[in-house]
């Protein structure tokens, strides 16, 4: 199981590629990994914001790319997709930006 520090380092190393290929403006970890409550079966929750909208197919491609890169199942959401204010507040409390 990777640590939060290892995950952050991997994402930092690929930040330029994420920006160029997927138009990622910012990337943040939230959920169990951000709260240091992850288990062997935990996935990693990642929030992205982008410079320009990307298609659903590109978003799925990015989610798969990150899962392969981190060797952990990634649940990816975009900043613009959070409409429920309670969910948004809960996520924002955990965010660790890379």
UniProtKB/Swiss-Prot annotation:
The lineage of its organism: Archaea, Methanobacteriati, Methanobacteriota, Methanomada group, Methanococci. Signal peptide: none annotated. A motif (GSX(10)DXD motif) lies at residues 31-45. It is an enzyme of class 2 (transferase). Probably forms a complex with cognate toxin MJ0125. Mg(2+) 2 binds at residues 43, 45. This is Putative protein adenylyltransferase MJ0126. Probable antitoxin component of a putative type VII toxin-antitoxin (TA) system. Neutralizes cognate toxic MJ0125 by di-AMPylation. Binds 2 Mg(2+) ions. Its cofactor is Mg(2+). GO terms for molecular function: ATP binding; metal ion binding; nucleotidyltransferase activity. Belongs to the MntA antitoxin family. The keyword Metal-binding applies. Pfam families: NTP_transf_2. It catalyses: L-tyrosyl-[protein] + ATP = O-(5'-adenylyl)-L-tyrosyl-[protein] + diphosphate; O-(5'-adenylyl)-L-tyrosyl-[protein] + ATP = O-[5'-(adenylyl-(5'->3')-adenylyl)]-L-tyrosyl-[protein] + diphosphate.
